[in-house]
């Protein structure tokens, strides 16, 4: 045999035959329909942060169309805790997907990677084999496991490798798009331009990629900081006298008024519009001024030389300015009752569109939480964040005639701006999470009736039963699964990402953006809280990386906190996160009552809450034992 023939025979014998691929293939066709290309994809994101999802399919439902339109006009970047998806031509083998709860690796068939740090984000995955109202057949949907929050303003990639198998048991083939130098239009070019980021991160492993999308997560920090600093500069002062309403054994109650800037456009209650207006620098633009009332509880005891420490209360939906002072019809039985004996004053206001601030003067808070107008819901929350900035500025210069509280022993009662605290409850915890992130004056905070994940809010919440409300609002059929993997719900959650508590939590200690010094935070959970179920609370606790006071009542809390390197800690504890104290306390709900309210109705919870702030006022916040007094 001639030498050339021998060489050809040797080459043929030594080269392995190509491995067969599955008939199921990933679909990446940017010239097709909406779900024929992966999402998020950089070609849908505009330079101003708005998102073009105008071709999102589904029935002509008013709320769905409003979500599509508002993301196109008022969106602020892709979500960090929202869903991603990729369609396939046929069914896959679900057993080839990564297991939930197992730490991700680059050997997984599907993973989400931070292309700037190379960190992997744990995922929750679902393959939707059947068509539903808002999703096609054979759609693979991934969400970050709620509580693992991808970094803000950072390039990420959702990657499917050839370790994913089709229903025939064979590996899915590589999408031709990954090796094409051109074609597919502007959106295809936008993704193609970012693929080198993934190639660099994966190196030789890039050859095993079957499909991928590369995108930059949104960042709410810059806008939050602009809102806070602009509102902080508003000239804040009490309008007229601060008058005494009544006295209780431990404190006196006062009421006053102040003006606040309103940044939302349009007419209240914002059934239309309601979006904040921003200038070219990103600062909010004042549309008008509104006069609101505040309530103030002043301890009936000697005032410290620097003034009383002051807690700012952010009430739940419908709560009045007196929510920290009274408990329903029980005057003087609010949390001010346990703060005042420890020398801590308290102040509160109503939310916008609540009580006398609502059109007609008697709002119960429903229109604040306006799901029918998603951008107004988002910016109602941000408007309240701005108002607490104004209130904090007011409080630094606020004085009360000392003769009104003789026990204070001062001619003029003042408040110590170096010892300001925040407590947000329920809806107020969403606002409070942002306030904690944005204002350096606040040195410690408590969030009660609190949790994370707008996706969970839309599908898990029992009070109100959100999944049952979502169905008619979005025109679901009985065959539809109302879960976190439904793409239309990601549109809603993306709109609300700037007020997502899980996004705020890293900014309390670990990822300081809108503030420069860390803060101590206490999460208070009742089990079961039907407004924020344990998985929702755990998601927030994970994102904040708190420790739970031992023994934990919810075993899943221990398991899930372990994923982020925290867990049970014996009380008392403090300074467990650098110099800050980050804790979660859990209590059983009282009989026939919802765990949502344990901070108000369990005596031992009230004391533990008060001790947290009393110790913060002394220099270091401490999570004390439930059955112990203050240190």
Which residues make up each language-model segment?
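Short, solvent-exposed loop/turn and secondary-structure capping segments
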Residues: 97-101, 122-125, 153-156, 167-178, ...
